[in-house]
Amino acid sequence: MIEEILPAEVAAIDAVDEDVADLFAVERAAIGGAVPERRREFAMVRKSARTALGQLGIPPVPLVPGAGRAPVWPTGVVGSMTHCPGYRAAAVARSSRVHALGIDAEVSEPLPSGVLQMIGLPSERAMLARLDEQHPEVPWDRLLFSCKESVYKIWYPLAGTMLEFDGAEVEIDPGGGFSARFTAEGPVAAGRRVSHLSGRWLHRDGLLLTGIALGMINLPGISLRRDDHSPRLQLAISSGELTRSSLGWN
């Protein structure tokens, strides 16, 4: 599914299987202290990432966490990984074609009570109220969270600093697109200041997916479908509240 919201320049793989996935020794060392469920997620999403890299002609390589726990991709490649219960995905592209990638997957259910007030700007909360009246079948607050996660995965490799949830104002198009405007000075890509991003979203099979591909030529972003077209401590949703976690890069 994830490939439907990313351009043809991007190799994207997703899966719902629970097959055992092997890790390189250096990867096992990097995740050795984690609980079994976390180690399984770490391995499975890297299986998808290596499959996607294979579509670019790149043989299997270790994908270890680097600065800010972000995965270190092979030279000449940009990428992004994500997982949620029952789903995992990875997207990669040549850095000569795409400058940065951000994808996120969430279970299609509303955010826990109080979380929207923590992540949403007043303008965003007003937008969600309007969208909910028109299309109540979509958990718009969770979609907003996912959009902001994809935005962050674009931001961090370019800026190398944290981006708080109020650092970007998101506007969601019910037709399947979204845009994000940085509320402070944006990062630099290909010698140009990036002030806003555009992406796509998909709601299907109990999942919410978001994706952004920041193009090298047509900055600020590539948002067409294929058929027409310092470390962050992530605020992760856990047990009904936001908790700080360093596992947001997958």
Regions found by a protein language model. Name each.
Residues 1-250:
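Core catalytic alpha/beta fold that binds nucleotide/phospho-ligands
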